[in-house]
């Protein structure tokens, strides 16, 4: 039997973005209110993954494993955030991008296209990783780097 960890909080105000309706999530055990998703498949019901604060995950995007999305971060398109990855602040992950491992995307950073961020890499400030970019192995990309 699968134990669900969250539900769509349909009793709370929704958010409209890109002609999509996003719903707040609510933890079933604690009742804590989290961020926004378009549908239940945006956040895995297994593991400790979570979407908090005013973060938004929509489209075909997925958050799984023990990944955390927080602040006002956005994950969209078919992007995936998995493992112990963190996406926070005003960061954006979109397209077919993958953020995994113990990686962090924070500040106003943007990861898009087919970019891959993994193995404890850090992308922050207003840095951009796009196209087929790959950032791995504890690499750190900050400032206005592209």
Range-by-range predicted roles:
Residues 1-48, 54, 72, 114:
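Terminal amphipathic alpha-helical/low-complexity segments used for targeting or macromolecular assembly
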């Amino acid at each position: 039997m699968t134990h669900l960890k969250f539900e769509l909080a349909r009793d709370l105000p929704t958010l409209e973005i890109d002609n999509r309706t996003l719903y707040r999530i609510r933890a079933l055990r604690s009742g804590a209110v989290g961020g926004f998703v378009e549908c239940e498949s945006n956040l895995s019901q297994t593991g400790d993954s979570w979407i908090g604060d005013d973060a938004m995950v929509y489209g075909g995007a997925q958050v799984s494993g023990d990944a955390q999305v927080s602040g006002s971060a956005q994950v969209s398109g078919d992007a995936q955030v998995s493992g112990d990855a963190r996406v926070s602040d005003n960061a954006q992950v979109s397209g077919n991008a993958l953020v995994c491992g113990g990686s962090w995307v924070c500040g106003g950073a943007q990861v898009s296209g087919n970019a891959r961020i993994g193995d404890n890499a850090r992308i922050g400030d207003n840095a951009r990783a796009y196209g087929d970019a790959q950032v791995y192995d504890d690499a750190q990309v900050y400032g206005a780097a592209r």
